[in-house]
């Protein structure tokens, strides 16, 4: 991977280096403190600035409504239920590099949306096929520590029993207000059998959905469309987009996510090859 030093910045009186990453870069967290242990959103902890460089804030009329992830220099992936009711791209704004939902740091950038593609088999009743793509009007010219794409999973990866991260500005409890700062929470990827037992009455299709464990942690209002990600040891710990936050029963009891690997062919038919 080529990394080119391009400029030296002074931030809060301290020197920091801005790095320009190749366009095939994905799933890195250059600013993470390597000594940090995983945190134990509902039950989560505030992320550090720049910890999750693919996470975006989707805005409508200036207000955060959903999360999403950068998957290349011009496309965002999110949940279909975030945009299904209003598919006019002109009403949305995508904000990248954001930590403080109310006050943007100087590296934060925003983009208008050119087009929206909702999965043709999305059901607003069952939330099946809860996946959508948003094309930005202007490309992201340069990947930096603060915004770069997430990696995609391979088709045969299940990640069962591995620790995953849900990231967003969602409410800390049911009925609560959005968080001001980006939060992260960890939970285990459940096996398909445990997932089906947890949500009865045929609510789960393991071929296209994945579940995370509860333990008083999970996504809530405002986290929808955001990433559920796992560090992949087979790829030097790069972070892989396993799921898109879709739904749950209340808050703090894990969640149900759209299984990204199940839609890889559909995604690539719209945006071209994904990064993995």
Model-derived regions: residue spans:
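Protease-domain processing segments flanking chymotrypsin-fold serine proteases, especially trypsin-like
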Residues: 2-77, 91-98, 276
């Amino acid at each position: 991977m080529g990394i080119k030093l391009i400029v030296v910045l002074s931030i809060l009186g301290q020197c920091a280096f801005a790095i320009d990453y190749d366009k095939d870069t994905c799933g890195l967290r250059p600013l993470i403190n390597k000594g940090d242990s995983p945190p134990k959103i509902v039950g989560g902890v505030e992320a550090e600035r720049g910890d999750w460089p693919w996470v975006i804030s989707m805005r409508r009329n200036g207000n955060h409504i959903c999360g999403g992830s950068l998957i290349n220099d011009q496309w965002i992936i999110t949940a279909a239920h975030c945009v299904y009711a209003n598919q006019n791209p002109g009403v949305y704004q995508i904000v990248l590099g954001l930590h403080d939902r109310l006050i943007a740091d100087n590296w934060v950038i925003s983009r208008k949306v050119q087009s929206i593609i909702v999965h043709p088999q999305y059901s607003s009743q069952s939330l099946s096929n809860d996946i959508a793509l948003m094309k930005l009007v202007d490309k992201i010219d340069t990947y930096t520590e603060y915004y770069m794409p997430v990696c995609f999973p391979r088709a045969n990866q299940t990640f069962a029993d591995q620790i995953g991260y849900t990231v967003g500005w969602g409410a800390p409890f049911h009925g609560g207000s959005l968080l001001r700062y980006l939060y992260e929470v960890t939970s285990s990827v459940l096996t398909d059998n445990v997932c089906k037992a947890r949500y009865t009455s045929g609510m789960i299709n393991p071929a296209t959905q994945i579940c995370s464990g509860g333990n008083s942690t999970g996504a809530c209002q405002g986290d929808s469309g955001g990433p559920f990600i796992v560090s992949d040891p087979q790829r030097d710990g790069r972070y892989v987009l396993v799921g898109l936050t879709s739904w749950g029963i209340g808050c703090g009891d894990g969640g149900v996510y759209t299984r990204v690997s199940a839609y890889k062919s559909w995604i690539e038919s719209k945006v071209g090859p994904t990064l993995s």
